Amino acid sequence: MKKIENFNILICNTPNIENAKLIAHNLVKEKLAACVNLFNGMTSIYEWEGNIEEETEVTMLIKSKSEFLNLIEERIIELHPYDTPEIIELKVVSSNTKYFEWMNGVLKN
């Protein structure tokens, strides 16, 4: 394992697989994300406007660099149907060396 800085995993939920794929393809094509994992059929329970809601969503794990956070946020907001899309950043502290090198090689310089 290699200690790394400035890499992150972003979590974002979307209402359906089509929207998740649209966002994922755009982020990878634009080299803002090295990889996006899609978890279909996740159940989200949350409060919205005073009501407890339960929805089936698609969770995206977006693997990227911290420096792209604002650009990724802009793209998600542009392509996402929710008024308030969830975008949460988790810092990556270490990674398999070869995976890190691959990620670094496919992302924008």
Where are these regions (language model features)?
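Positively charged, small/polar-rich N-terminal and surface patches that mediate targeting and assembly
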Residues: 1-109
